[in-house]
Swiss-Prot record:
Zn finger region (RING-type): 41-82
Taxon lineage: Eukaryota, Metazoa, Ecdysozoa, Nematoda, Chromadorea
Keyword Zinc-finger annotated: yes
Matches recorded under SMART domains: RING
Protein's UniProt name: Uncharacterized RING finger protein C32D5.10
Region annotated Disordered, chain positions: 1-36, 390-411, 431-515
Coiled-coil positions: none
Composition bias, Low complexity: 432-447
Record's keyword terms, sorted: Metal-binding, Zinc, Zinc-finger
InterPro entries: RNF141-like, Znf_C3HC4_RING-type, Znf_RING, Znf_RING/FYVE/PHD, Znf_RING_CS
This protein's record includes keyword Lipoprotein: no
Organism: Caenorhabditis elegans
Biased composition annotated in UniProt, kind: Polar residues: 1-28
UniProt biased composition (Acidic residues): 448-470, 478-487
Length: 610
């Protein structure tokens, strides 16, 4: 079995309890120092993590920061006072690590900014989110201060101002991190920062793991190299406690929340105690038997279950890699949660809109396969179903086809129907047909006269006023109306004249029938069904000439021609010669003539040759 990496110098064997005892036995002067604000590292400008002091000047820095400074800096000098450095010493240990040992162990290689595209996108995306949150907090503060009861809301204003300060602090850390990326800082130094690692637990980033970290570390191997793993875990856990988001967070409003506080902020100075618990748990059980419930108890239940699971995954990846903390940070790869693909999947990274803060719920369970389907915001906009996510078959963003429903695309226009037959000859209209009974049976039970120029929509008209108006009438075709003389079946536009002495039926007393009906379909749809012969030659041309001659509007020509036809029929001096098979037109009643004239005007057969 391969031995663990020796990039970190062997430390003197010391138990984790020694760290706790050294902190418990403090002088009064050290207690006063606890009350003072914690110093910041002059290299990273953040709170010192894994405090390490220099040999001669005793200035303190982060362990990772001073190691990177001594290896890639101008020389073994203090970053603050330029005093030569012969060795460094971690707080809580007696081991002195010389500069020669640090250089022999290897330094994190500087990385070009173009090689950290993903890391830069991760940080830049979080910076934009911080700026949006600050603007939102400013709007809420302004709205709360302008209210009349602002004194009662003073605690809320103080809470909002505190959240704004925390957001500004996080924004400054992220901007410095992005500046380091632009200036070619090593990937290990970027990924090991608490400002970057907290993005992993805020559901912004997903770890793609290491290809050589699949074999779990056994308890025997862990105990044989306990000094190495003690130093590795201490460096890792010191950073992670400042990265894990606390379970309870203040809310900006009723809809939005933000990770303001970490486990370090709410642990009340119990970081070393938590580190001791986790180290003892790994020493007793190994990495295979780590239980989320027990790890949560070791973290004092201050983080959510989701964060605990992500923390265990990172912890196992580090230990199973058998690398130091910096080496592991330089080797592991991360991607934005909304991206699909990656080098580990054999694909190019497919990026989507960075404004999406969280991954959609339907994609969160699909992490078993390394070949992720492409997901874009257009799938939801255009109504695509997400069932394909469970079948493993990506679906196009747009659903095209005859049965597709697209809210952004109008329905196709209906195909226009063919032109109907021109009309019915006069001889057929005035001749009794043997098929009148069958035509009558095909007709509707009620026949409605429709006038397009009537303005009395939905208004009830008295019977006396209806005779002088154009209100549609409804006639019944029931067997009780035995005096029927003329029947118009307008559903298929077929007119049938009967030579029996029957009068028109009375209008049906029906409130719904008294209301005017509108054409639901174009008139050509009715003309297609009419069983007619060709009109006399030139009749339609004469009607067109009349329309052009008097410059009739096309929308009102039908009504004007109906009135003209009615007046022309009344003024007829000589009646038309009647036959034995057709009734005398001169004997028609005015209502019968109006019915006939209405039909003629609709079919275009209006003009009568003298």
């Amino acid at each position: 079995m391969d031995s663990p990496s020796t990039s970190e110098s062997p430390l003197k064997k010391n138990t984790i309890q020694d760290f706790g005892e050294s902190n418990m036995t403090e002088s009064p002067q050290s207690k006063e120092e606890i009350d003072e604000p914690e110093e910041e590292c002059s290299v990273c400008k953040n709170e010192i993590i894994d405090t390490t002091s220099l040999s001669d000047c005793c200035h303190e820095f982060c362990y990772d920061c001073i190691v990177g400074w001594l290896t890639k800096g101008s020389g073994p000098f203090c970053p603050m006072c330029k005093t030569p450095v012969s060795f460094i010493q971690r707080k809580g240990t007696d081991e002195k690590i010389t500069v020669q040992q640090i250089k022999s162990e290897g330094e994190p290689a500087a990385t070009a900014s173009e090689d950290l595209v993903t890391e830069k996108r991760i940080v830049s995306r979080k910076i934009r989110s911080c700026r949006r949150l600050m603007n939102q907090i400013d709007e809420i503060i302004g709205a709360t201060s302008s209210r009349s009861d602002s004194q009662k809301r003073k605690p809320r204003l103080e809470e909002l101002n505190s959240m704004k300060q925390l957001c500004v602090s996080q924004l400054n850390s992220l901007q410095m991190l992005r500046d380091d990326i632009d200036h070619g800082a090593a990937k290990a130094l970027i990924v090991s920062k608490a400002a970057f690692r907290r993005l992993i637990y805020e559901r912004q980033v997903i770890s793609e793991g290491l290809p050589d970290a699949t074999n779990s570390l056994s308890k025997t191997e862990f105990r044989d190299n306990i000094d190495h793993y003690r130093a590795v875990l201490h460096s890792f856990l010191s950073v992670e406690l400042k990265s894990l988001p606390a379970k309870t967070q203040p809310r900006v409003d009723n809809e939005n929340s933000w990770y303001f506080y970490t486990l370090h902020d709410v642990a009340e100075g119990k970081d070393e105690e938590i580190i001791n618990r986790i180290f003892s748990m790994i020493e007793d059980r190994g990495t295979r038997d780590l239980n989320a419930r027990e790890v949560d108890a070791a973290l004092n239940g201050l983080v959510s279950c989701r964060v605990v699971i992500a923390f265990i995954a990172e912890l196992k990846s580090l230990i199973n890699s058998r690398k130091s903390f910096l080496e592991w940070c330089g080797a592991i790869t991360y991607r934005i949660r909304t991206d699909r693909g990656g080098e580990s999947a054999g694909n190019d990274v497919v990026t989507v809109d960075d404004s999406i803060e969280l991954e959609p719920e339907e994609n969160r369970s699909n992490h078993r396969s390394r070949r992720f389907p492409v997901f874009t915001p257009f799938d939801r906009v255009f109504g695509s179903t997400m069932g394909h996510m469970y079948r493993g078959q990506p679906q196009a963003p747009l659903r095209l086809g005859p049965n597709a429903t697209n809210p952004f695309r109008p329905a196709p226009l209906p195909v226009p129907s063919q032109l109907p037959i021109a009309g019915i000859p006069w001889a057929e209209l005035t001749t009794s047909s043997a098929g009148a009974g069958s035509a009558r049976s095909r007709g509707s039970d009620s026949v409605v006269e429709i006038d397009d120029d009537d303005d009395n929509d939905g208004v009830d008209v008295d019977d006396d006023d209806r005779e002088d108006s154009d209100e549609p009438r409804t006639y019944s075709n029931s067997e009780e109306d035995s005096d029927e003389e003329i029947q118009v079946v307008e559903r298929d536009d077929t007119i049938i004249l009967d030579d029996s002495n029957r009068s028109l039926p009375k209008p049906v007393a029906n409130g719904s029938a008294d209301r005017k009906r509108k054409y639901e379909f174009p008139l050509e749809d009715h003309w297609k069904k009419a069983k007619t012969s060709q009109l006399p030659e030139g009749l339609v041309d004469d009607v067109q000439e009349l329309i052009a001659k008097y410059n009739m509007p096309l929308t009102q020509s039908m009504n004007m021609l109906v009135g003209a036809a009615q007046e022309a029929i009344i003024r007829i001096n000589k009646p038309m010669p009647s036959t034995s098979s057709a009734p005398d037109i001169s004997k028609f009643k005015p209502d019968d003539m109006l019915q006939l004239a209405s039909y003629l005007s609709r079919t275009g057969a209006l003009s009568r040759r003298q």
